[in-house]
Amino acid sequence: MKQKSLNSKGVKVVLVALLMGALSCKEAPKEQPKDVGTPEVSMKATEPFFKLSLAQWSMHKMVREDGVDPYTFAEKAKNWGFTGLEYVSALYYKELEAANFSKEAMASFVEKCNAESKKHGMQNVLIMIDGQGDLATPDAQKRKKAVENHYKWVDAAADMGCHAIRVNLSGSKVPDEWVASSVDGLTQLATYAKDKNIEVLVENHGGLSSNAVMLAEVMTKVNMDNCGTLPDFGNFCIERSKDGCAQEYDIYKGISELMPHALAVSAKSYNFDAEGNETKLDYPRILKIVKDAGYTGFIGVEYEGSVLSEEQGIIATRDLLIKAGKELN
């Protein structure tokens, strides 16, 4: 009897344990598999393949005509949904020229820009340099002077944490002469900039610089890691007349030829239709060229139209970029 009683008690204990285990499994929330974190993956799949920066030229009328302080650039760009800043040197020339571009004036420019970008959590991307001399002039002495005029901007870019300066290749209109002069001017400047960890970028910006195959040839001959292109979606007019552009390079061919050398990209825009598409430029087609080249850096919005206000044009360009970029994912 004693042995039977013990066996009976043992069976009861086992049954109770099994019942409690079943109840605890039923009530306890199921542990999610570790690889279920798909929302993040899904979110990334719907994000564009690039980051958004704002070219300050998009607000040049605000600064020059409406009296907007250029040092509010970071604040405005932040409010418009950008994360990167592309400064335009010419919008600060009033104060800098008055001080003859002294070291103190340049240091003040850098300090103010850094303070504002830090305050608003923005990234300084590059500085677009204009009016500092012709880097592609056939006159060696003038070319050297132009190169040296850019040194202070290389220094400023380095102090601001930018990765590059954008330069122009103004100068000769004779193809062979322009190529040779461009190679020399860029090599001199890129050599100086290399020690500062700054890239020297050439934008297709009129004249022979808008002849993409020639600009690509210049890049190949310079052959320096810190010298490249900044393809602009719209600046492919080689020669102008009183009626407009007399000779324009094929936009899509040009972007395709410049992208292998691209270290930055500029999204030019002029006007938009009712659906928000750019009326001259096929953004989906252009962005596919950019993506196929493996580019994943900043794309800078540069609105240059006259129908919309600058703020409206900036936002319209931003929205079109995001829309077209997402569609390529």
Predicted regions and their residues:
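Catalytic domains of carbohydrate-active enzymes, especially glycoside hydrolases
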Residues: D69-L91, M160-G161
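Glycine-rich, proline-tolerant flexible connector loops at the mouths of alpha/beta enzymes
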Residues: E86-C113, S170-V174
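C-terminal motif of bacterial Sec signal peptides marking the signal peptidase cleavage site
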Residues: G21-S24
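Acidic/histidine-rich catalytic cores of soluble enzymes
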Residues: E47-F49, V183-K288
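Hydrophobic faces of well-ordered beta-strands that scaffold small-molecule active sites
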Residues: F50-Q56, L85-Y87, N124-I129, I165-V167, ...
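Short, low-complexity, disordered segments immediately C-terminal to signal peptides
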Residues: K26-S42
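Active-site acidic/histidine proton-transfer and metal-coordination neighborhood
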Residues: V110-P231, E311
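Short, acidic/polar
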Residues: R64-A77, K144-D155, Q247-I255, Y283-I286
